[in-house]
């Protein structure tokens, strides 16, 4: 059984026990439980994609860690003028462990 969930404007394929890296969830602390909205649930041959049914299904996950991603460099350069600008960025992520995917009601 697996589900497609939405978090931070992105979609992730998750199963029970998976550890997934999502954009930072600022409201939670390590050990807290979060609910993720579900877009699709696949249980064997049964595929549930009806939004009315999925509105009642929330995937449960536990926050494992908050951390920063790899550093990226942003460089702007204009030829022959000496114009150079450098900027760095490190995205903040939250690692979550999926604990429960409720089955869709038949």
Swiss-Prot record:
Transmembrane ranges, per UniProt, are none
Q: Which GO terms describe its cellular component?
A: cytoplasm; ribonucleoprotein complex; ribosome
Domain of life of the native organism: Bacteria
Coiled coil (residue ranges): none
Q: Which UniProt keywords apply?
A: Ribonucleoprotein, Ribosomal protein, RNA-binding, rRNA-binding
Q: Which Pfam family, any one, appears in the UniProt record?
A: Ribosomal_L21p
Question: Which biological process annotations from GO are given for this protein?
Answer: translation
InterPro entries assigned: bL21-like, bL21-like_sf, Ribosomal_bL21, Ribosomal_bL21_CS
Q: Name one GO molecular function term.
A: rRNA binding
Question: Can the keyword Ribosomal protein be found in this entry's annotation?
Answer: yes
**Family, per entry:** Belongs to the bacterial ribosomal protein bL21 family.
- Matching PANTHER family: 50S RIBOSOMAL PROTEIN L21 (PTHR21349), LARGE RIBOSOMAL SUBUNIT PROTEIN BL21M (PTHR21349:SF0)
Subunit structure of this chain's protein? Part of the 50S ribosomal subunit. Contacts protein L20.
UniProt function note: This protein binds to 23S rRNA in the presence of protein L20.
* Protein known as: Large ribosomal subunit protein bL21
What would be the name of the gene that encodes this protein? Answer: rplU
């Amino acid at each position: 059984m697996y589900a497609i969930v939405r978090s931070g404007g992105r979609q992730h394929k998750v199963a029970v026990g998976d550890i997934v890296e999502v954009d930072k969830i600022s409201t939670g602390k390590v050990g807290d439980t979060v609910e993720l909205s579900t877009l699709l649930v696949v249980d064997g041959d049964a595929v549930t994609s009806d939004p009315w049914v999925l509105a009642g299904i929330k995937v449960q996950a536990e926050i494992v860690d908050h951390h920063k991603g790899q550093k990226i460099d942003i460089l702007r350069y204009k030829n022959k003028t000496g114009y150079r600008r450098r900027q760095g960025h490190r995205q903040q992520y939250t690692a979550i462990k999926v604990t429960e995917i409720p089955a869709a009601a038949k």
